């Protein structure tokens, strides 16, 4: 994951949280590969609730929820991704804009599909 902008210090607690969140993402991916989607969802949802500042848990959850037809959940996660990633200090402004644009496009496509 990209570092913070120059001059912004990360606290020890923030570092520990980031490491725990990253470990949960890896556990979530392993759970998905093993076919345990409920465990994967729980791990990703915790990171979403904590505002993990990278796209992996949001993208994985949206994919799972869309496959299940749980479009309300997919929309909720997309909106949270846009909120968290737009405010993240862990990426450059250009990276933030690009990532947020991807999630906004996914949200628009989901909403169009729902109206469809």
Question: What does each of the following model-derived ranges do?
Answer:
Residues 7-23:
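TPR-adjacent "capping" and linker segments in tetratricopeptide-repeat scaffold/adaptor proteins
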Residues 20, 27, 60-61, 107:
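Structural register within alpha-helical repeat arrays
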